[in-house]
């Protein structure tokens, strides 16, 4: 029947996709801090790079680890006598363990949990996660990236990881640096103080 006529309005929005990653390298920033370089890539729905796009980055501590590392005759073992304690949004600031900054920024000032970066013409933006050496292997964090495409279509991505310790320390040291978690010893493994 050709007398039936209907009309449907569609809204077509450009969509973007974010990928967050790291090359796995750890740099000694100074005598007290490590820096882990990261990058993000944003692609449009047609897979072309999303150039000059502002991306918001947020860093949250999701877990702290309490307990001790073990030492034996040939070296030391990664933390084994431990408990992972979840850090909720209401206590994240109390256990904030790292700072997120644009790549190359070493003057992070206050412990910053958020930053904005702009993608280059290839859709990439670099940033660093900086943290005290004493927290390596004792804290788990999550990087959240988001970018708005239009008013209703935010794109999001995340990456979570345990703050790493350089492999040279793992192989060269006969005793573990920072053997006891700064968040609590083996006897405190019930997470009641977290």
Each language-model region and where it sits:
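Generic recognition of flexible, low-complexity loop/linker segments
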Residues: 44-45, 114-116
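Short, hydrophobic beta-strand segments
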Residues: 1, 104-108, 115-121, 125-135
């Amino acid at each position: 029947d050709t007398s039936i006529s209907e009309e449907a309005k569609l809204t077509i929005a450009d969509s973007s996709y974010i990928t967050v990653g790291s090359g796995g390298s750890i740099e000694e920033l100074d005598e007290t801090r490590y820096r882990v370089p990261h990058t993000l890539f944003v692609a449009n729905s047609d897979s072309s790079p999303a150039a000059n796009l502002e991306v918001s980055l947020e860093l949250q501590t999701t877990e702290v680890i309490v307990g001790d590392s073990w030492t034996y005759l040939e070296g030391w073992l990664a933390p084994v006598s431990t408990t992972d304690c979840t850090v909720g949004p209401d206590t994240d600031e109390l256990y904030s363990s790292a700072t997120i900054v644009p790549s190359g920024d070493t003057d992070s000032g206050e412990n910053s949990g958020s930053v904005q970066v702009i993608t280059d013409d290839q859709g990439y933006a670099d940033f660093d996660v900086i943290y005290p050496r004493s927290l390596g292997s004792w804290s788990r964090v999550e990087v959240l990236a988001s970018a708005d495409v239009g008013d209703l279509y935010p794109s999001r991505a995340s990456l979570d990881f345990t703050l790493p310790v350089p492999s040279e320390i793992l192989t060269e040291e006969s005793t573990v640096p920072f053997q006891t978690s700064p968040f609590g010893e083996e006897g405190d493994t019930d997470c009641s103080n977290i």
